[in-house]
Amino acid sequence: MGGALIHGWAKSGRVEHIAVADKNEALLAQFKAKYPALATTTDNAEAVKGADIVVVVVKPWLMPVVLGEIKAALDLEKQIVVSDAANFTTGKLAEAFGREGQFCYVIPNIAAEYGASMSFIAKGQGASEETLSRVKALYDLVGDTLAVSENLVGPGMMMASCGIAYVMRYIRAQMQGGCEMGFYPAQAKQIALQTMQGAVSLLKETGWHPEEAIDKVTTPGGVTIKGLNELDHADFTSAVIRSLKAGLK
Protein backbone atom coordinates (compact mmCIF):
# COMPACT_ATOMS: atom_id res chain seq x y z
CA MET A 1 0.00 0.00 0.00
CA GLY A 2 2.88 2.34 0.77
CA GLY A 3 4.27 1.93 -2.71
CA ALA A 4 0.91 2.72 -4.30
CA LEU A 5 0.65 5.94 -2.28
CA ILE A 6 4.21 6.98 -3.12
CA HIS A 7 3.61 6.47 -6.84
CA GLY A 8 0.26 8.25 -6.68
CA TRP A 9 1.55 11.28 -4.79
CA ALA A 10 4.66 11.48 -6.95
CA LYS A 11 2.56 11.40 -10.13
CA SER A 12 0.42 14.22 -8.72
CA GLY A 13 3.44 16.51 -8.99
CA ARG A 14 4.34 16.64 -5.28
CA VAL A 15 7.39 14.38 -5.36
CA GLU A 16 9.74 17.04 -3.99
CA HIS A 17 7.61 17.20 -0.84
CA ILE A 18 7.84 13.48 -0.09
CA ALA A 19 10.34 11.69 2.15
CA VAL A 20 10.20 7.89 2.21
CA ALA A 21 11.66 5.63 4.90
CA ASP A 22 12.11 1.89 4.47
CA LYS A 23 14.60 -0.67 5.72
CA ASN A 24 14.81 -2.15 2.21
CA GLU A 25 17.58 -0.22 0.46
CA ALA A 26 16.93 -1.93 -2.88
CA LEU A 27 13.32 -0.77 -2.80
CA LEU A 28 14.38 2.78 -1.95
CA ALA A 29 16.82 2.71 -4.87
CA GLN A 30 13.97 1.77 -7.21
CA PHE A 31 11.88 4.69 -6.02
CA LYS A 32 14.85 7.06 -6.28
CA ALA A 33 15.60 5.91 -9.83
CA LYS A 34 12.04 6.63 -10.90
CA TYR A 35 11.63 9.86 -8.91
CA PRO A 36 15.05 11.54 -8.49
CA ALA A 37 13.58 14.39 -6.42
CA LEU A 38 12.25 11.93 -3.84
CA ALA A 39 14.00 11.97 -0.46
CA THR A 40 14.77 8.47 0.82
CA THR A 41 16.26 7.05 4.00
CA THR A 42 16.42 3.81 5.97
CA ASP A 43 16.03 5.81 9.20
CA ASN A 44 12.38 6.28 10.19
CA ALA A 45 13.21 8.96 12.74
CA GLU A 46 15.17 10.94 10.15
CA ALA A 47 12.28 10.82 7.69
CA VAL A 48 9.77 12.46 10.04
CA LYS A 49 11.93 15.44 11.00
CA GLY A 50 10.38 18.64 9.69
CA ALA A 51 7.43 16.85 8.08
CA ASP A 52 4.02 18.49 8.25
CA ILE A 53 2.20 15.17 7.87
CA VAL A 54 3.67 11.81 8.88
CA VAL A 55 1.94 8.84 7.23
CA VAL A 56 2.76 5.44 8.73
CA VAL A 57 2.02 2.67 6.23
CA VAL A 58 3.06 -0.70 7.66
CA LYS A 59 1.37 -3.91 8.73
CA PRO A 60 -0.65 -3.43 11.94
CA TRP A 61 1.68 -5.59 14.05
CA LEU A 62 4.63 -3.41 13.03
CA MET A 63 2.98 -0.16 14.09
CA PRO A 64 4.20 -0.23 17.73
CA VAL A 65 7.76 -0.82 16.52
CA VAL A 66 7.73 2.02 13.98
CA LEU A 67 5.96 4.44 16.31
CA GLY A 68 8.53 3.65 18.97
CA GLU A 69 11.31 4.52 16.52
CA ILE A 70 9.84 7.90 15.58
CA LYS A 71 8.32 8.97 18.90
CA ALA A 72 11.29 11.00 20.11
CA ALA A 73 11.72 12.71 16.74
CA LEU A 74 8.12 13.91 16.50
CA ASP A 75 6.72 17.23 17.65
CA LEU A 76 3.13 16.28 18.40
CA GLU A 77 2.23 19.93 18.98
CA LYS A 78 2.89 20.69 15.31
CA GLN A 79 2.96 17.48 13.29
CA ILE A 80 0.03 15.42 12.03
CA VAL A 81 0.34 11.64 12.33
CA VAL A 82 -1.71 9.37 10.08
CA SER A 83 -2.22 5.64 10.58
CA ASP A 84 -2.75 3.73 7.34
CA ALA A 85 -2.71 0.36 9.10
CA ALA A 86 -5.93 -1.65 9.24
CA ASN A 87 -7.63 -1.41 12.65
CA PHE A 88 -4.84 0.77 14.07
CA THR A 89 -7.17 3.59 15.05
CA THR A 90 -6.47 7.07 16.40
CA GLY A 91 -7.13 5.69 19.87
CA LYS A 92 -4.27 3.26 19.40
CA LEU A 93 -2.06 6.13 18.20
CA ALA A 94 -2.90 8.05 21.37
CA GLU A 95 -2.12 4.97 23.44
CA ALA A 96 1.23 4.49 21.68
CA PHE A 97 2.26 8.11 22.21
CA GLY A 98 0.74 8.41 25.68
CA ARG A 99 -1.36 11.42 24.70
CA GLU A 100 -3.83 12.80 22.19
CA GLY A 101 -2.58 14.70 19.18
CA GLN A 102 -3.36 15.65 15.61
CA PHE A 103 -4.08 12.05 14.63
CA CYS A 104 -6.02 10.64 11.69
CA TYR A 105 -6.89 7.10 10.64
CA VAL A 106 -7.03 6.58 6.86
CA ILE A 107 -7.63 3.49 4.75
CA PRO A 108 -6.97 3.97 1.00
CA ASN A 109 -6.71 1.23 -1.62
CA ILE A 110 -4.11 0.12 -4.14
CA ALA A 111 -5.70 2.12 -6.96
CA ALA A 112 -4.04 5.16 -5.33
CA GLU A 113 -1.09 4.47 -7.63
CA TYR A 114 -3.28 5.49 -10.57
CA GLY A 115 -5.16 8.33 -8.86
CA ALA A 116 -8.25 6.16 -8.42
CA SER A 117 -8.32 5.22 -4.73
CA MET A 118 -11.45 5.27 -2.61
CA SER A 119 -10.12 6.36 0.78
CA PHE A 120 -11.81 6.73 4.17
CA ILE A 121 -10.58 9.19 6.78
CA ALA A 122 -11.47 9.73 10.42
CA LYS A 123 -9.91 12.21 12.81
CA GLY A 124 -9.01 11.53 16.40
CA GLN A 125 -10.56 13.18 19.45
CA GLY A 126 -7.71 15.65 19.75
CA ALA A 127 -7.51 16.52 16.05
CA SER A 128 -8.89 19.73 14.59
CA GLU A 129 -11.12 20.21 11.56
CA GLU A 130 -8.14 21.87 9.88
CA THR A 131 -6.14 18.68 10.37
CA LEU A 132 -8.95 16.65 8.83
CA SER A 133 -9.09 19.00 5.84
CA ARG A 134 -5.33 18.89 5.29
CA VAL A 135 -5.14 15.11 5.39
CA LYS A 136 -8.22 14.77 3.20
CA ALA A 137 -6.64 17.10 0.63
CA LEU A 138 -3.54 14.89 0.62
CA TYR A 139 -5.54 11.76 -0.14
CA ASP A 140 -7.72 13.58 -2.66
CA LEU A 141 -4.56 13.75 -4.79
CA VAL A 142 -4.80 9.98 -5.31
CA GLY A 143 -8.56 9.53 -5.71
CA ASP A 144 -11.78 10.17 -3.81
CA THR A 145 -11.77 10.57 -0.03
CA LEU A 146 -14.75 10.26 2.29
CA ALA A 147 -14.60 11.68 5.83
CA VAL A 148 -16.46 9.34 8.19
CA SER A 149 -16.73 8.49 11.86
CA GLU A 150 -14.01 6.08 12.90
CA ASN A 151 -16.40 3.15 13.31
CA LEU A 152 -17.14 3.32 9.56
CA VAL A 153 -13.54 3.12 8.37
CA GLY A 154 -13.60 -0.67 8.77
CA PRO A 155 -16.78 -1.13 6.71
CA GLY A 156 -15.35 1.30 4.17
CA MET A 157 -12.21 -0.81 3.96
CA MET A 158 -14.31 -3.90 3.26
CA MET A 159 -16.19 -2.12 0.47
CA ALA A 160 -13.31 -0.30 -1.20
CA SER A 161 -10.03 -2.01 -0.28
CA CYS A 162 -11.13 -5.63 0.03
CA GLY A 163 -13.85 -4.78 -2.45
CA ILE A 164 -11.29 -4.40 -5.23
CA ALA A 165 -10.53 -8.11 -4.88
CA TYR A 166 -14.23 -8.94 -5.01
CA VAL A 167 -14.68 -6.89 -8.19
CA MET A 168 -11.64 -8.64 -9.69
CA ARG A 169 -13.23 -11.99 -8.89
CA TYR A 170 -16.38 -10.97 -10.77
CA ILE A 171 -14.30 -9.80 -13.75
CA ARG A 172 -12.43 -13.10 -13.71
CA ALA A 173 -15.71 -15.01 -13.68
CA GLN A 174 -17.02 -12.97 -16.60
CA MET A 175 -13.82 -13.68 -18.51
CA GLN A 176 -14.14 -17.40 -17.83
CA GLY A 177 -17.71 -17.33 -19.08
CA GLY A 178 -16.61 -15.46 -22.19
CA CYS A 179 -13.91 -18.02 -22.92
CA GLU A 180 -16.40 -20.87 -22.49
CA MET A 181 -18.66 -19.16 -25.03
CA GLY A 182 -15.85 -18.86 -27.58
CA PHE A 183 -13.85 -15.68 -26.97
CA TYR A 184 -10.08 -15.64 -26.59
CA PRO A 185 -8.90 -14.63 -23.08
CA ALA A 186 -7.65 -11.20 -24.24
CA GLN A 187 -10.98 -10.53 -25.93
CA ALA A 188 -12.91 -11.69 -22.87
CA LYS A 189 -10.85 -9.36 -20.67
CA GLN A 190 -11.45 -6.42 -23.01
CA ILE A 191 -15.19 -7.09 -23.00
CA ALA A 192 -15.36 -7.48 -19.21
CA LEU A 193 -13.37 -4.30 -18.51
CA GLN A 194 -15.27 -2.15 -20.99
CA THR A 195 -18.58 -3.45 -19.67
CA MET A 196 -17.53 -2.61 -16.11
CA GLN A 197 -16.36 0.85 -17.20
CA GLY A 198 -19.61 1.43 -19.07
CA ALA A 199 -21.67 0.48 -16.04
CA VAL A 200 -19.67 2.86 -13.83
CA SER A 201 -20.00 5.69 -16.37
CA LEU A 202 -23.77 5.19 -16.59
CA LEU A 203 -24.23 5.49 -12.84
CA LYS A 204 -21.87 8.46 -12.51
CA GLU A 205 -23.31 10.42 -15.41
CA THR A 206 -27.00 9.75 -14.78
CA GLY A 207 -27.14 9.49 -11.00
CA TRP A 208 -29.35 6.44 -11.41
CA HIS A 209 -29.77 3.79 -8.75
CA PRO A 210 -28.30 0.54 -10.15
CA GLU A 211 -31.79 -0.94 -10.34
CA GLU A 212 -32.84 1.84 -12.74
CA ALA A 213 -29.99 0.92 -15.07
CA ILE A 214 -30.95 -2.75 -14.80
CA ASP A 215 -34.50 -1.88 -15.85
CA LYS A 216 -33.14 -0.14 -18.96
CA VAL A 217 -31.61 -3.36 -20.29
CA THR A 218 -34.15 -5.87 -19.00
CA THR A 219 -37.18 -6.78 -21.10
CA PRO A 220 -39.96 -9.27 -20.31
CA GLY A 221 -38.97 -12.73 -21.44
CA GLY A 222 -35.56 -11.46 -22.57
CA VAL A 223 -32.11 -12.92 -22.07
CA THR A 224 -31.06 -10.38 -19.41
CA ILE A 225 -33.79 -11.33 -16.95
CA LYS A 226 -32.90 -14.99 -17.39
CA GLY A 227 -29.30 -14.26 -16.41
CA LEU A 228 -30.34 -12.04 -13.50
CA ASN A 229 -32.59 -14.77 -12.18
CA GLU A 230 -29.69 -17.23 -12.32
CA LEU A 231 -27.66 -14.80 -10.18
CA ASP A 232 -30.54 -14.62 -7.71
CA HIS A 233 -30.92 -18.41 -7.63
CA ALA A 234 -27.22 -18.59 -6.75
CA ASP A 235 -27.66 -16.03 -3.92
CA PHE A 236 -25.31 -13.59 -5.68
CA THR A 237 -26.48 -10.55 -3.69
CA SER A 238 -26.33 -12.40 -0.37
CA ALA A 239 -22.85 -13.71 -1.19
CA VAL A 240 -21.60 -10.18 -1.85
CA ILE A 241 -23.10 -8.86 1.38
CA ARG A 242 -21.65 -11.76 3.38
CA SER A 243 -18.21 -11.19 1.86
CA LEU A 244 -18.28 -7.53 2.86
CA LYS A 245 -19.32 -8.32 6.44
CA ALA A 246 -16.97 -11.30 6.87
CA GLY A 247 -13.91 -9.17 7.58
CA LEU A 248 -15.69 -7.30 10.36
CA LYS A 249 -16.26 -10.39 12.48
Q: PLM ranges: what are they?
A:
Residues 28, 47, 184-191, 213:
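Small-residue helix-packing motif on alpha-helices
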Residues 1-50, 116-117, 179-181:
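NAD(P)+-binding Rossmann beta1-loop-alpha1 motif at the extreme N-terminus of oxidoreductases
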Residues 193-249:
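NAD(P)-dependent Rossmann-like dehydrogenase/reductase catalytic/cofactor-binding core
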Residues 24, 86-88, 108-112, 194-196, ...:
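Glycine-rich beta-alpha junction loops
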